[in-house]
Amino acid sequence: MVRRYCDKIEDTGAGNPFQCHQGFPGDARIRRAGGADVPIHELPPFLRVLLVMDGTVTKILEAYFWEPVEVVTLRQEFVPAERPIPWLRVDPGERVLVRRVHLSGVESKRVYAAAFSVIRTQLVPEAFRQQLIDRRIGIGVLIRDSGMESYREVLEVGIEPEDGNNAPTLAPKKSDLVFRTYRIIIDGKPVILITERFPLHLYG
């Protein structure tokens, strides 16, 4: 999964119709892997909100689906970067924390979203890093509660089929996944890279 980011370049305009300097996207389209591009206005309204929001995804999912949502950690480990990751300014051999989670309804057990993160832990305070490693809390909530100055920059949005590797939804049937990749800038440096995927059939 980390390899997904290795061939990306800093100029992300082609994959992101939601850049702030471009204004309202209007009739923009997003890419569908292996198929025709999709006009953004055809996406369910709440999914459009999720693609552009700058806040805690867990809380907005709770408000929309009206049940508690928990972060279920599926994978978390330190790995050396095999190749450069331009979006994070990571060099080969640099140690990063990779993390894969599901955002699941506590009562329904439905997986509303899946997220994969690459984190440069050496660039965050020790207390933040330890809470992250201990899996005590989600990244968005942790940043909010830490009081650190940060902002999110959306880099890429698109639609791809679920293939069992990118984000299994535990649903009775496979679903197209609407995704966004963004990075979190802290103290002027890219520190966290996250791809969130949302099963389309749950939001239609």
Regions found by a protein language model. Give the residues of each.
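N-terminal domain-onset segments
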Residues: M1-V98, H102-V178, I185-G204
